[in-house]
Swiss-Prot record:
Name of the protein in its database record: 5-taurinomethyluridine-[tRNA] synthase subunit MTO1, mitochondrial
PANTHER family, alphabetized: GLUCOSE INHIBITED DIVISION PROTEIN A, PROTEIN MTO1 HOMOLOG, MITOCHONDRIAL
Naturally occurring in which organism (per UniProt): Mus musculus
Entry-linked NCBIfam families: mnmG_gidA
GO cellular component annotations of the record: mitochondrion
A GO MF term: tRNA 5-taurinomethyluridine synthase activity
Binding site for FAD: 42-47, 154, 217, 406
Catalytic activity: 5,10-methylenetetrahydrofolate + uridine(34) in tRNA + taurine + GTP + A + H2O = 5-taurinomethyluridine(34) in tRNA + 7,8-dihydrofolate + GDP + AH2 + phosphate + H(+)
Tissues expressed in: Ubiquitously expressed in various tissues, but with markedly elevated expression in tissues of high metabolic rates.
Cofactor section: FAD
Length: 669
């Protein structure tokens, strides 16, 4: 017997027996109480990754969603990736996540951003066919072993007494649906997106919705508040959609995809569509007439008047006009699909009344006769302070309850997917009582994302950038598999044999290729004769290796094969291998210094803080009340994480360090 909380009261109940369930269920199809290892609430980008990851780890998983037909829906922009975001996608893929593979099957315009800089900060990006992406994602989800999908709205959580030895006031044991039925679970993951008390806004009109056409989640938001979670409010928005045939593309700047197109997934040798068959994007700009319409009608825009914070790095046109007056702002015209008649004007997120949106659109070059098919709108929603979760994404207050995605204050499909895959892995590991799978700041962009959230929190929608990452040269998009796949295979069991073998082949091929390149040595004068374009000094006395020559911008693997076909030709048979050898050569000299810095940081991260430590009451360590409260809120797991919390002083860190060492010594005795 255990305590449960259902629909606002406490009662006693016993666990229902496990039953095999069909892959897809209706809301009322449960003849008796079902029981799963992991229940995931929400079928967006965090939810799909979480559910699939938990199932890959061997857990019987249920994905609950308001509507099965919206699983994998791209609610805002028709694109994935970008600067920083492309890194996250590569890391999700290295953990055997879904979104990268699905993008390689659904893209209509692939391009690498930031190419003027080094490959460590390149941003893989693609325009995606909305319809195709959703179809491919649903096909993947509905065919995943151990994963069941059910339509249903969750209104409450089933709670029990906490497990001894773990932080938390209670333990989640299941969910209560809107029809009053209960589903029991060992772990629960909330990936509710913008649905917690979601409100859509156009002009002065407001109505409850988590997304256009979908009802918000009210009961669950109230439950979380009653449990003591700190709840905040954020906002976001989306642009109007335009009719393709009504736009004059002939006078606009045309942008074509890359040739060849680089896929997102390490399992993909190429994307599904040839560069010549991909669709172009077009660029236009706002003008002073757009500014005038915005400024003259602020009184008709309640979304702008609200003090709720929106995304800093994806602002509405109203925010841009107010913050940067008298400037022209880019508007990218992006296709929504191969057979779609809609164009997404990226950069034109707006919440003015619909008639003013139409007036504003027709002021823009190329859009003078554009037809608005759907108006833009704003969304306001609840989020939970992410300092209330651990790096495994399990909450401090309720054991075995995990949060992932926009509920943690992030923005973007990629940030949501990254959290989803980590939450899914750890929810499954929690069921089997195994240690959590945590990615540190020194191991990946995912680690930086989660560490920022759990130690610093956020008061505005958080977006990933390369500038947030200390060890960018080591945490590149090209090496995410060698950084994460082997760990995930060993510690979490979430990686398929196909991916593991592919990563193993790539790792051994890189090591072999680098060794061969180092072994080929000639004088600088001979290299100059072989490859005249390299800017090498012929006065160098020491022999120069092929790896050193490959560092020059003018040289790639194909150049070397042209003069040394016998030992090197096999390394260009795989385009990705040849590209990675070039990148490894480019960064070889600086990586040794960064690896030493990483080791120093890892020493701090290795000093674990006891998870049962009560910062508010412990007297064995000297801490101010302010520091105690900050540590109690964030509950850092290591000395390194504690040092990154704003307001935690160096003196407090020293005292914590002494406490940890003395505790460790006493336990050893």
């Amino acid at each position: 017997m255990f305590l449960l909380r259902g629909r606002g009261h406490w009662a006693a109940a016993s666990l229902g027996r496990r039953l095999p369930l069909r892959r897809l269920r209706s809301d009322s199809a449960a003849p008796c109480t079902p029981h799963f290892d992991v229940v995931v609430i929400g079928g967006g980008h965090a939810g799909t990754e979480a559910a699939a990851a938990a199932a890959r780890c061997g857990s019987r998983t249920l994905l609950l969603t308001h509507r099965v037909d919206t699983i994998g829906q791209m609610s805002c922009n028709p694109s994935f990736g970008g600067i920083g975001k492309g890194h996250l996608m590569r890391e999700v893929d290295a953990l055997d996540g879904l979104c990268s593979r699905i993008c390689d099957q659904s893209g209509i315009h692939y391009k690498v951003l930031n190419r003027r800089k080094g490959p460590a900060v390149w941003g893989l990006r693609a325009q995606i066919d909305r319809k195709l992406y959703k179809q491919n994602m649903q096909k993947e989800i509905l065919s995943t072993p151990l994963l069941t999908v059910q339509k249903g709205a969750v209104e409450d959580l089933v709670l029990a007494e906490p497990e001894p030895g773990y932080p938390g006031k209670s333990r989640v044991r299941g969910v209560v649906l809107a029809d009053g039925s209960t589903i029991y679970a060992e772990s629960v993951i909330l990936t509710t997106g913008t649905f917690l008390r979601g409100m859509i806004i156009i002009g002065l009109e407001m109505h409850p919705a988590g997304r256009l056409g979908d009802q918000p989640s009210i009961g669950l938001a109230q439950t979380l508040e009653k449990l003591g979670f700190m709840v905040g409010r954020l906002k976001t928005g989306t642009p109007p959609r335009l009719g393709k045939e009504s736009i004059n593309f002939s006078i606009l700047n045309k942008h074509t995809p890359d040739d060849p197109s680089i896929p997102f997934s390490f399992l993909s040798d190429s994307v599904w569509i040839k560069p010549e068959d991909q669709l172009p994007c077009y660029l236009t700009h706002t003008n002073p007439r757009v500014d005038a319409i915005v400024l003259e009608n602020l009184h008709l825009n309640s979304h702008v008047q609200e003090t709720t914070k929106g995304p800093r790095y994806c602002p509405s046109i109203e925010s841009k006009v107010l913050r940067f007056p008298n400037r022209l702002h880019q508007v990218w015209l992006e296709p929504e699909g191969m057979d779609s008649d809609l164009i997404y004007p990226q950069g034109l997120s707006v919440t003015l009344p619909a008639e003013l949106q139409e007036k504003m659109i027709t002021c823009i070059r190329g859009l003078e006769k554009a037809k608005m098919v759907h108006p833009g709108y704003g969304v306001q929603y609840d989020y939970l302070d992410p300092r209330q979760i651990s790096p495994s994404l399990e909450t401090h207050l309720v054991q075995r309850l995990f949060f992932a995605g926009q509920i943690n204050g992030t923005t973007g499909y990629e940030e949501a997917a990254a959290q989803g895959v980590i939450a899914g892995i750890n929810a499954s590991l929690r069921v089997s009582r195994k240690p959590p799978f945590v990615v540190s700041r020194t191991e990946g962009y995912i680690g930086v994302l989660i560490d920022d959230l759990t130690t610093l929190g956020t008061s505005e929608p958080y977006r990933m950038f390369t500038s947030r990452v200390e060890f960018r040269l080591s945490l590149r998009p090209d090496n995410a598999d060698t950084r994460l796949t082997f760990r995930a295979h060993k510690e979490a069991g979430c990686v398929s044999s196909q991916r593991f073998e592919r990563a193993l082949w790539m790792k051994s091929s890189l090591e072999e290729g680098i060794s061969v390149l180092k072994s080929i040595k000639f004088s600088s004068s001979k290299w100059k004769k072989l490859i005249p374009q390299i800017p090498i000094s012929i006065n160098r006395s020491l022999p120069v290796s092929a790896l050193d020559v490959l560092k020059y911008e003018e040289v790639d693997m194909e150049s070397l094969v042209g003069v040394l076909p016998e030992p090197l030709e096999k390394y260009t048979a795989c385009r990705e291998l040849a590209r990675r050898l070039k990148i490894e050569a480019s960064y070889e000299s600086v990586l040794s210094y960064q690896l030493q810095e990483i080791k120093e940081v890892q020493q701090d991260e290795a000093l674990q803080l006891p998870h049962e430590l009560d910062y508010l009451t412990i007297r064995d360590v000297s801490l101010s009340q302010e520091v105690r409260e900050k540590l109690h809120l964030s509950r850092p797991q290591t000395i390194g994480a504690a040092s990154r919390i704003p307001g935690v002083t160096p003196a407090a860190i020293i005292n914590l360090l002494r406490f940890v060492r003395s505790t460790r010594q006493s336990r050893q005795q």
